[in-house]
Amino acid sequence: MFAALAFAFPQQLKSSRALPLLNRWQQAGPRVSVSIDSFLAVAPEHAYDDLIDEAASVHRVDPALIRSVMASESAFDPWAVSRAGAQGLMQLMPDIAVAFGVENPFDPRQNIMAGAQLLRELLDQHHGNLVLALASYNAGAGIVAQYGEIPTIRETQDYVKRVTGLLADAHATP
């Protein structure tokens, strides 16, 4: 398995995120629902396009925004877990996942649908203000409400810049 992936994706395997992902796949064994052939056929950033499009349609959220959040949050790793405990592709905190009815935060469909629903709610809460919605997604709505603007938390400020940059790039690409 590793030989096939190393041959097919030599540059990607140099990234710090690739090897832990491959190790988790190897350890998961038969629980992994993706085959090597399907992995090799679809780049990770496009593996979830159908789910992203579905979530975007259901929750009226720009699919490029969902993809940008997912890229920033998990680098398209469905098994990602942050130091704070956020889980899955859209890095849902456990309490948020429960509130949105997510039974398995590592299930791509459940995670993407809940993440898109959360984005929609935050956009509505902030009257369409993308910057405040993203700050709330990262730091929590309560903290953003306290500040009344992007909090002076470096991680949140960097997050908003990163996601809006990815979104701008996505809209600039034909």
What would you call each of these model-derived segments?
Residues F2, A18-L19:
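Generic N-terminal initiation segments characterized by hydrophobic and/or small/turn-forming residues
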Residues L19-P174:
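Catalytic glycan-binding domains that act on GlcNAc-containing polysaccharides
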Residues M1-P10:
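Hydrophobic membrane-insertion alpha-helices, especially the h-region
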